[in-house]
Amino acid sequence: MTAGSDALAAEVRRALALVIDPELGENVVDLGLIYAVAVEDGVARVEMTTTTPGCPATAFLKEAVQAAAWGVPGVHYAEVKLTYEPKWSPAMMNEVARRNLDSR
């Protein structure tokens, strides 16, 4: 990756932070649901998971992540790959999400 694609990947990650998990009310980045973001030749590739394989919000989250990535200037196409390896756990959340969920 080049410095430009690294910067664009960082922009995509910031855009993904606007996608809120409807069940937990926190964004997918802080929840640790985004495993990888890469951009090459205007194509954003996002690898993500959900909290459980049977998550009822899976389709919504995948579509919202794709739309958020695609909305970043310089991204001409966005691919989202859903994976359950490694399996998500609450330990993957950052401190902000953990604190917000603990206060509810």
Question: Language-model segments: which ranges?
Answer:
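Domain-level signature for proteins that mediate thiol-based redox and metal-cofactor handling
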Residues: 1-104
